[in-house]
From Swiss-Prot:
Its main location: membrane. It holds the Pfam family CDH. It is a single-pass membrane protein. The gene is cdh. One of its GO terms (cellular component) is plasma membrane. This is CDP-diacylglycerol pyrophosphatase. Signal peptide: none annotated. Belongs to the Cdh family. Its EC number is 3.6.1.26.
């Protein structure tokens, strides 16, 4: 019993330390790198010279930019043209805020252009990390390939995913996830952030503790995946963990 208690205490200490390290990372100047690129480079260059560089696309009227990430051959980031830190922002549950997940899904075409041929929808995934699961303090959705093992697991659970948020059998990558099936028409009309905040008990008060991902299914529906920070299981809610930036699924 004493050994079990000691092990439990050690796990708590490790979890707290890990959380502290994550927070420390977010307080340095490097955590503002993406925001500076968007607000000080991409946006001014587009407005003054009609050139989105270093971004791949800048849409001031629609409120977003698309940037090629340095990590991985096909990974892109979709980011707002104004200040939003991350999933904890109340702006994400405001109906007037752009539907960033839907916009990010449209931006998947940049992957195909970079690849030189169409990237199948089944190979694409979108993900945003929680407040403690990210390294940047500017809202960004990762547009990248899905891990083959995650793709296989979601395919096997296709019939088990409903239009309500329910635990995904077995979780993903050793962490618990909620899964919800949505149609394309539903996704166009309503942001996944609003679905999470309005449909999962107490989620609205703790949005910053959630990571959120989206994947297309073989029946042309989408599955939303939400994981919540849990220090006892060392889950920082980094939904990006379902992605493979080296795109093994395309080989």
């Amino acid at each position: 019993m004493k050994k079990a208690g000691l092990l439990f205490l050690v796990m708590i200490v490790i979890a707290v330390v890990a959380s502290g390290i994550g927070y420390w990372k977010l307080t340095g100047e490097e955590s503002d790198t993406l925001r500076k690129i968007v607000l000080e480079e991409c946006l001014p260059n587009q407005q003054q010279n009609q050139n989105p560089s270093p971004c791949a696309e800048v849409k001031p009227n629609a409120g977003y930019v698309v940037l090629k990430d340095l990590n991985g051959p096909l990974q892109y980031l979709l980011m707002p043209t104004y200040r939003i830190n991350g999933t904890e922002s109340p702006l994400l549950t405001d109906p007037s805020t752009p539907n960033f997940f839907w916009l990010a899904w449209q931006a998947r075409d940049f992957m195909s252009k970079k690849y030189g041929q169409p990237v199948p929808d089944r190979a694409v995934s979108l993900a945003i990390n929680s407040r403690t699961g990210r390294t940047q303090n500017h809202f960004h959705i990762h547009i990248s390939c899905i891990r083959p093992d995650v793709r296989e697991q979601l395919d096997k659970n296709l019939a088990n995913i409903s239009s309500r948020w329910l635990p995904l059998p077995g979780g993903l990558r050793g962490h618990e996830y909620l899964a919800r099936r949505v149609t394309e028409s539903e996704l166009v009309q309503r942001s996944p952030f609003m679905m999470l905040a309005e449909e999962v008990p107490e989620a609205r008060e703790h949005m910053g503790s959630y990571g959120l991902a989206m994947v297309r299914q073989s029946d042309n529906s989408f599955v939303l995946l939400a994981t919540q920070r849990n220090l006892l299981t060392l889950n920082r809610a980094s939904a990006e963990e379902i992605q493979d930036h080296e795109c093994e699924i395309l080989r």
